[in-house]
């Protein structure tokens, strides 16, 4: 009879909780709480629709810089992560009053900067003390922090907006402070990191072309997710005229799906392999986004919210798993994942700025979703190219 693996020791559980909290604050709240806030910002007259969309793009631009800078903080995660979380909380408090547009751009950029750095350092810091047999489950729990932020903001923000827009910003900031303080001592001790293995990994064997193509796929995936991440609530609230409450309701569905997405896609990969699971997931995204081009009824909104919501955090374990299949060296795996995170950030930032310009000129949400479906079609094509290249590489080894 197979024995159930023992529960993680308290120190491991605290580290997992701390990393989950970091992604909850740095990504779940810092990025996704803005989605239900966006139509309220427009309705309150703080900014116009085009300016409000640019604020979402500013966050993604900061995320790119944070992902690049985050590698330098990995050796100091136990000290850097809580400070980054507090800085994230400060960005909400700074936006609690109708101040000039440049002020909001600055703080939304900072919130992206801290979130990108937390995405790079949080999970590795916690997972290095988790037993190998439990890292899959632990990773799923950590990335669930993103989904919890999406779902939590979808429930909390509409309630706070009944008090006032400024109160909503300030309360989300206070929540981020509370979560940071509660998990501060959960981070595991830092360890010194040597540059020797990294230098050897980057200057030794040639870099596989299949890995490069896969990293590009991850960037295209990021671009395809932006229409839902930034514009879904605004599409329902203003585009369909259903109101902020309805838009936030679908955002809760989106977030609830995001909390379980990594585990679902991970289980699928365990059954059919990461290669096939990634192809299936990309195909699902094409249909789930494309359905909005032909229908905006409840069933279409449910399908798109559930499927795309699950894939926002669920894409990470699939791409990471494929990279681990390509690279058996842990150092090269880490380098590849770092590069993938940076390219993902580039895809998000570039897509966000492009779509903000498009939306400012057209005001048509369906153009944005058409872009998303097209991006996933391109990602699927490139993924199949990467699979063929990798198969040939393995055959010649």
Name each model feature, range by range.
Residues 330-362:
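A late C-terminal transmembrane helix in Major Facilitator Superfamily
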Residues 132, 137-188:
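Helix-loop-helix hairpin linking two adjacent transmembrane segments in secondary transporters
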Residues 87-99, 284-296:
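C-terminal ends and interior cores of transmembrane alpha-helices
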Residues 102-111, 299-307:
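Paired small-residue
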Residues 66-78, 261-273, 359-360:
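Helix-to-loop junctions at the C-terminal end of transmembrane segments
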Residues 107-145:
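Cytoplasmic helix-loop-helix junction between adjacent transmembrane helices
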Residues 117-130, 314-328:
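Intracellular juxtamembrane helix-capping segments at the cytosolic ends
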Residues 35, 211-255, 262:
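Extracytoplasmic gate region of multi-pass secondary transporters
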């Amino acid at each position: 009879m197979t024995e159930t693996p023992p529960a993680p020791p308290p120190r491991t559980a605290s580290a997992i909780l701390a990393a989950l909290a970091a992604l909850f604050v740095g990504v779940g709240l810092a990025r996704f709480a803005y989605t239900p806030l966006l139509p309220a910002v427009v309705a309150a007259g703080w900014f116009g629709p085009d300016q409000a969309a640019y604020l979402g793009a500013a966050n993604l631009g900061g995320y790119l810089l944070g992902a690049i800078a985050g590698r330098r903080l990995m050796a100091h995660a136990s000290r850097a992560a809580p400070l980054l979380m507090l800085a994230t909380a400060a960005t909400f408090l700074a936006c609690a009053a109708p101040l000039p547009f440049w002020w909001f751009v600055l703080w939304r950029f900072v919130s992206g900067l801290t979130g990108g750095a937390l995405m790079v350092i949080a999970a590795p810091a916690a997972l290095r003390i988790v037993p190998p047999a439990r890292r899959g489950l632990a990773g799923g729990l950590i990335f669930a922090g993103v989904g919890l932020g999406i779902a939590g903001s979808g429930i909390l923000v509409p309630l706070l907006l009944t008090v006032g827009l400024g109160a909503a910003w300030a309360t989300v900031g206070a929540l981020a402070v509370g979560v940071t303080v509660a998990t501060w001592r959960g981070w595991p001790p830092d360890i010194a990191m040597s540059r020797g293995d990294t230098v050897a990994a980057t200057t030794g064997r040639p870099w596989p072309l299949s890995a490069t193509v896969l990293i590009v796929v991850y960037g295209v995936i990021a671009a395809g997710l932006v229409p839902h991440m930034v514009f879904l609530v605004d599409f329902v609230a203003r585009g369909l005229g259903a109101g902020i409450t309805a838009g936030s309701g679908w955002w809760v569905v989106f977030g609830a799906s995001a909390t379980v997405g990594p585990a679902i896609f991970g289980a699928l990969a365990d059954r059919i392999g990461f290669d096939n699971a990634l192809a299936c997931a990309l195909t699902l995204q094409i249909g789930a986004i494309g359905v909005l081009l032909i229908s905006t009824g409840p069933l279409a909104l449910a399908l798109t919210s559930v499927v795309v919501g699950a894939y926002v955090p669920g894409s990470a374990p699939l791409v990471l798993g494929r990279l681990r299949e390509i690279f058996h060296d842990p150092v090269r795996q880490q380098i590849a994942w770092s590069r993938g995170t940076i390219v993902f950030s580039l895809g998000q930032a570039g897509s966000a700025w492009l779509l903000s310009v498009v939306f400012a000129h057209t005001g048509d949400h369906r153009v944005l979703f058409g872009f998303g479906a097209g991006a996933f079609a391109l990602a699927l094509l490139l993924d199949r190219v990467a699979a063929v290249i990798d198969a040939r590489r393995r055959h010649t080894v």
